[in-house]
Structure formats: C-alpha cells, structure tokens
Amino acid sequence: MKIFAVIVTYNGMQHDWIGKCLKSLEQSTMPVTAIVVDNNSTDGTREYVPEHFPDAVWFPQEKNLGFGQANNLGIKYALDNGADYILLLNQDATIHPDALRLLTDASDGESLLSPVHLNGDGTKLDEMFRISIKPKDGMLFSDLLLNKKLEKSYETGEICAACWLLPANVVRKIGGFNPLFFHYGEDNNYYQRLVYHKVKTLLVPRATMCHDRVFYGNEVAFNKNKYRRDVLLIVLNINYSVGNILFQLVKLLLRTYSYDFRNYRIGTFSFEMLWLMSHLRTILSARKTDKSTGISWLN
C-alpha cells in the first residue's frame, strides 16, 4: 500500500511546526512518503526541510500559490506515482503513530476519512472540530456516553482539511481543489462537491491528530477576502439551484449589515457583486467542472 502525505508550508519554522509535523510522519507505524510544497517561505523553511528531511519530496515554489493549488501539486505527484491513499496534513499538525493504520483499516476505498482532531498538546478536542462535528445519525455520541464499543468509523458532516485521508479513487472522482479559492474556503467547497457526488465523510474515532493553532488559525489570513470567500462558497455550491443561490446571497447581504457591521467596509458587498458579474463565465465554467467526475483542477 502506497501512502503519500502532502504538506503545504508557508513559514513553517514558527513553533517548530514543520519539524514536528514531519517527525510525526516518520514515527507512523505505516510507511508514508512526505511531499512538501513550500509557498515561498522566508523564515528558513526552504533550507530546513531538505537538510533535515532528505527523504521528503520537496517542491519549493517561487511564489505563494495558496493552500489549494499547492496541495494540487502534491496530490498530482502522488497520483502519478501510484498512490493508494493521499493524506492532506497541515504544517501545524501532527498525527499519532497509529493514525494511518486505523484510518486505512476503516476505509472502504470510496470515502474521505478523518481522525479526531485534538488541540496542540492533545489534552482536548480542537475547538473548531468540537463545534463543527456533526455525526449523521448520532450513534457516535450515543456509543461514547453509554460506554459501548466504538465502531471503526462513523459517517459525519464536514470536517476541516487539516488532516484528510483521501483514497486515490475519491481523488480520481472529485479531482483537486478549485483554484478560485486562495486560502480558506477550499475545503468547504471540496466538501460541497463530495456531497454532490455522494461521497461519504467518515470519522475514525480511535485515530487522532493534534492541531497546534489558536481558534481561527491565522486570523489575518482568515479575514482577508472574507466576503469574496463567502460569495464563492454560495455561487460555487453545486448542490444549490439558481433560486437557492439568489436566496443565500440575500441572506449574506442581510447578515453583513446586521451582524458583521463592524467589519463591513462601505461598498464591500456591492464590490463583490460586481466582481462576481465580471467573472460570471469563469464561475459557470467552474460549476460545470465541479459537477463532472475526473481529476479536475490537477492538470
């Protein structure tokens, strides 16, 4: 079984993130080949990784491609080199030594898999994971509270892409990340596409990883182009009809004025609508691509 782990780095030396991340892969009980795609770091990451982890496949970039497109480079390399599974792992994340074994044991080969996301020191659930996890039938919480034997996996809703295990079959069906998203939102869009193509998301409760971040990660990066991202997540949601898209855009406008007023800049929403109209052909083409199956966005 060939497993590749794709890690996108950008100034990954802070808090020794990239060192801890790659060391956790070396300690995995299942062999895994690391693919590191660096988004033009300036903090020594570009020197540190090839020197200390010479077995990692190293793809330094001359500009910041963003999270999705950088991952696409690593995903394509993994597929081209016979990957059975592709692990997407954040630079600020580490996996438990048995995580890959437990994830692959629970795999049906046709579903996305995720371990339980813990905080940086592994003492509690990652905050975003805690508030977003939604098992489909409630049996996970029932089994936990009643101290029953846990199943290998439980179907769930959307899970952050800090640690995704993608069977190659899923990637060949769904493709890579949509390049219209630069940083944040690309995993939400990918989940929308999984839902459209009826690909399940499975949580493996005995597998764990640690995500060393504050609540919203990089707050500056998260808030940058927030409204563009919100608009894109609506208009590129291939589960929505035209009517539903218009309804969701109106809701976004009302929320912008009612709840996000402090962060609202005069004309922001109108500007995003003008941008949307000027890129309508690109949006429609992207929706068509996302509705098709195949290795879209990877060529």
Predicted regions located by residue number:
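Short, flexible, basic/aromatic active-site loop/helix in glycosyltransferases
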Residues: I133-G157
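A short, conserved alpha-helix in the catalytic core of glycosyltransferases
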Residues: G157-G175, L180-T208
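Short beta-strand-to-loop acidic/aromatic patch adjacent to the donor-nucleotide binding site
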Residues: A83-T94
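Short, acidic, metal-binding catalytic loop of nucleotide-sugar glycosyltransferases
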Residues: K23-V32
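Conserved donor NDP-sugar-binding/catalytic core segment of glycosyltransferases
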Residues: H96-M128
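A conserved acidic beta->alpha catalytic loop
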Residues: S24, D38-R46, K63, A93
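Glycine-rich, basic loop-to-helix element that forms the pyrophosphate-binding segment
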Residues: Q61-N81
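Non-catalytic, C-terminal membrane-associated alpha-helical segments of glycosyltransferases
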Residues: N223-N299
